[in-house]
Amino acid sequence: MAVHVENLSDLAKTNDGVAVSLNRYTDWKCRSGVSEAPLIPASMMSKITDYAKTTAKGNSVALNYTHVVLSLAPTIGVAIPGHVTVELINPNVEGPFQVMSGQTLSWSPGAGKPCLMIFSVHHQLNSDHEPFRVRITNTGIPTKKSYARCHAYWGFDVGTRHRYYKSEPARLIELEVGYQRTLLSSIKAVEAYVQFTFDTSRMEKNPQLCTKSNVNIIPPKAETGSIRGIAPPLSVVPNQGRESKVLKQKGGTGSKTTKLPSLEPSSGSSSGLSMSRRSHRNVLNSSIPIKRNQDGNWLGDHLSDKGRVTDPNPERL
């Protein structure tokens, strides 16, 4: 089983022949012309060389590359012509064979969509070889400034045993996250987003790729706010609640129409229009207390003493 080393200074101390798994992350800006960056910096290569010197005699140390993930986000306007070509380069080979077979992708920053490029390398190099490089070539983008931001994440292991893998063609996935915005600006975001690649390919069964337990975590979904709408009239809410209770007791489906209560005794001359006007007037005057007098009419406080006897002893009149 591979041993994961967090601190690069501890790499040379692991000299018992056990493979050491490493995960690397970096980011850079893509400018006009050709942008080329090594996957392993020179400072780390010196650590690997020291590790190779401390191993048992007769065993050659190998760099077993596993996967390379690039996240590209545009920094130019929409509908700008041109495209970029991303290639995985092996600088230890001369001529056109430097470009690894099947590890070339094309992307248009002017489309306004960030992209995710997954290179399934499964290749190995000796410790004294130059590391792989990522080459991004600008073709037809009319700008002198940077046109994209690249975030790279890759994994490899250092060990005394050589393993042979079969490389898979590179894949490009467009991200629907908005223009000039990418969710892969940190190593944790990259690990979370590429989890489906481990589920849909044989990369999941490779122990060298599963050095961390949080690799196969599904990205959390964005929380949406509560849905707001127009509330029903206050006079309807209590009746709906009572009717729903009655329907539940009777086993109804709740499809009956809720009728508004009549605000005054119905007569033959009253119409639905007059009732709606009266209900609208009562809603507007809801701030005035309403009570019923002796005649059964709706009156306010300013009219409650008119048209009736207020003296408790009517015999005096």
UniProtKB/Swiss-Prot annotation:
Highest rank taxon of the organism: Viruses
Subcellular location: Host cell wall; Host endoplasmic reticulum membrane
GO annotation, cellular component aspect: host cell endoplasmic reticulum membrane; host cell wall; membrane
Stretches the record annotates as Disordered: 223-317
Matching Pfam families: 3A
Source organism per UniProt: Red clover necrotic mosaic virus (RCNMV)
UniProt keyword Membrane, yes or no: yes
Full protein name: Movement protein
Subunit (UniProt): Interacts with host glyceraldehyde 3-phosphate dehydrogenase-A/NbGAPDH-A; this interaction plays a positive role in cell-to-cell movement of the virus.
